Amino acid sequence: MAAPNSLFVRACKRQPVERTPVWFMRQAGRYMSEYRAVREKYSLVEICKKPDVAAEVTITAAEALNVDAAIIFADLLLPLEVMGLPFHFSPGEGPVIEVPIRDAAHITRLRTDRAHDLGYVAEAVKKVSDHFGSKLPVIGFCGAPFTLASYMIEGGGSRNYLEVKKLMYNSPHAWDELLGKLVAVLSEYTADQVKAGADVIQIFDSWVGCLSVEDYRRYVLPRTTELVKALQHSTRVPIIYFGTDSATLLPSMRETGAEVIGLDWRVPLDQGWSLLEHSVAIQGNLDPVLLFAEWPELKSRAERILKQADGRPGHIFNLGHGILPHTPVQNVKDLAKFVHEYSSQLVGPRE
């Protein structure tokens, strides 16, 4: 942990800050010409597995945007490979699991003893941490147990999560075994990132919004809480837990014990924070598509979010999901600058 007193880390802990910190999910991506140039040489997975290149991509984006944190360049699905579930990226389709899980026997065969084989991610974290030192914190991350399990079972993206829910409802013991194995791998994987210099860990639960509150509490909350507690025990860095389409789940997500809850754009920030009883920090929550809007509209929406935060310690400005391809880079830069300037004028030091 190289930047424990940074604006971003202090906000994660709901400590007073001089202005609202800002960073963006998928801030290194195809919308940037520098990233596209790297992708002409390497595939996404090749970048992830080359620490020098992953670090370069991470650093370039953070410096170009002048944000308050650098999130390591990696992919959510990397842990699947070391568990014995190969995947590849299909043009136009995204990730494809070559042999999806369909039964308990397949779950039993999954390995949990190879998390250290993902050490190339930790090596990239170290390079980024060494580069920035105390100037800029580094965010490590992993996918949440539910979202990764969904990929493993569906074999890729899904509209109705039929196979996931069939296994969850019909084979609850096998389902819990799968999530337990994921927790074992993910806790080691993220702990290695922290040892390498990550100041914060974000857990991405991108698909959790497909669940009812009842199903989330019964089938997902216990193992997700286990992951958060394991990380807090072994690393003592703040944990951000982010899900999409999750407004109805927010009170339950708070029970994981994560220090920060990420909001998507579907719930107003002030309402989302109220649902969380203002007991945690929050991150969000601009609609990524607004980055395509003309500046007056984009500025107005960002201003609204900052006003909804109402000067409370613990707000980190971000999008409600990742930056989209073809997003105008200048809009992202202008937004980061505006958040810095407007939030410092709006609230000053927060007590």
Swiss-Prot record:
EC numbers for this chain: 4.1.1.37
Gene Ontology molecular function, alphabetical: uroporphyrinogen decarboxylase activity
Cross-referenced Gene3D superfamilies: 3.20.20.210
Site for Transition state stabilizer, residues: 75
Source domain of life: Bacteria
Family statement drawn from the similarity comment of this UniProt entry: Belongs to the uroporphyrinogen decarboxylase family.
Name the record gives this protein: Uroporphyrinogen decarboxylase
